[in-house]
Regions:
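Carbohydrate-associated surface elements
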Residues: 143, 164
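Short N-terminal targeting/anchoring amphipathic segment
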Residues: 35-54, 67-72, 77
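Membrane-proximal helix-turn-helix segments that form the acceptor-binding/catalytic region
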Residues: 31, 64-65, 77, 92-137, ...
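A conserved catalytic-core segment of Leloir-type glycosyltransferases
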Residues: 1-44, 85
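A short, basic/aromatic alpha-helical/loop segment that forms part
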Residues: 53, 167-169, 190-197, 218-220
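Conserved donor-binding/catalytic core segment of Leloir-type glycosyltransferases
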Residues: 138, 177-208
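Short hydrophobic "strand-cap" motifs at the C-terminus of beta-strands
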Residues: 140, 161, 187-189, 214-215
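Short, structured helix-loop element that forms part of the nucleotide-activated donor/catalytic region
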Residues: 147-150, 209-224
Length: 224
C-alpha cells in the first residue's frame, strides 16, 4: 500500500519534476492509499507529517469516503510554507494570510525555486480545503493552537493535547546508583535553528548542570 519513494534531493531534471508533482498533487499516492482504505476500512485516519512524501491528498481521499480525519501538527507548515515561522533568524508571520511572502523573502532554503514550489504547494493545499477535509487538528501546545486560530483556522477544529510520556517505566528502571550521579540533562533531536538549540546552549552556560546533546542537522558544525 506504500506510495513509491521519491528522492527529494535528486539533482536530475526528471527527479525534480517527480518531486514537484508529488508535493503539488500527490502524484503516485492516490491509488495506493485508496487501496489501503478499501482493505482496512478505518473509522478514523490519523495524519502526521504528511507533506511532501504523501501530501494532503490523503486527507481528501479519506474525507471523500466519509472517514473521520484527525491531523496532529508537529510544526507550522499550515501557516508557514517554510514550516518554522522564521525568516533570517527572526520570528515571521507574514505568510499567515499572504503566502507569496515566502517567494519575496526566499524563506525555503534561501532558494527562489524552492520558495516558489513552497508557495504553489500552500496555494494548492490551502486552508479552506484542509479545514473541509480535516475534522480535528491536534496541537501539542496552547501557543500553537492560538497561532492556528490567529491564522484563520476555526477554534472548533482545534484540540490541545500536549506531548506526553509515561513515567512508570522510567521510575521502575532507575538504578539507585545512577540516580546518585551528577545532575545533568540531555537534548536529543535535530540540530537546527527552529529547535532553539542555540538558546539552550546559552542557558546551559548559566546552570551548574551538565548538558548532553545528541543529534545532527545544519547547525552541527557550528555547535561542535
Amino acid at each position: 500500500f506504500f506510495a513509491k519513494e521519491i528522492n527529494f534531493s535528486s539533482t536530475s531534471l526528471s527527479g525534480k519534476i517527480k518531486a514537484a508533482k508529488r508535493i503539488l498533487w500527490g502524484t503516485g499516492v492516490k491509488e495506493s492509499f485508496k487501496e489501503l482504505l478499501k482493505d482496512f476500512q478505518p473509522d478514523i485516519v490519523h495524519l502526521n507529517n504528511i507533506h511532501s512524501y504523501l501530501s494532503p491528498l490523503v486527507a481528501r481521499l479519506a474525507h471523500e469516503q466519509g472517514i473521520k480525519v484527525i491531523w496532529t501538527l508537529h510544526d507550522y507548515k499550515l501557516l508557514c510554507p517554510a514550516y518554522n515561522c522564521l525568516c533570517k533568524g527572526e520570528v515571521c508571520e507574514a505568510c499567515f494570510f499572504h503566502k507569496e511572502n515566502v517567494i519575496r523573502r526566499k524563506c525555503m532554503k534561501d532558494n527562489l525555486l524552492a520558495s516558489i514550489l513552497a508557495w504553489a504547494e500552500a496555494k494548492n493545499w490551502n486552508k479552506k480545503k484542509l479545514m473541509e477535509w480535516t475534522d480535528t487538528f491536534i496541537c501539542p501546545s496552547r501557543f500553537m493552537a492560538e497561532k492556528m486560530q490567529q491564522g484563520g483556522y476555526s477554534s472548533e477544529k482545534l484540540q490541545i493535547i500536549h506531548n506526553f510520556i509515561s513515567e512508570e517505566p522510567i521510575k521502575s528502571d532507575v538504578n539507585p546508583s545512577i540516580s546518585e550521579r551528577e545532575n545533568s540533562y540531555a537534548y536529543i533531536g535535530r540540530l537546527s535553528e527552529e529547535k532553539g538549540v542555540e538558546s539552550l546552549l546559552k542557558a546551559a552556560t548559566q546552570l551548574p548542570y551538565t548538558l548532553y546533546m545528541a543529534g545532527t542537522g545544519p547547525l552541527k558544525n557550528d555547535l561542535v
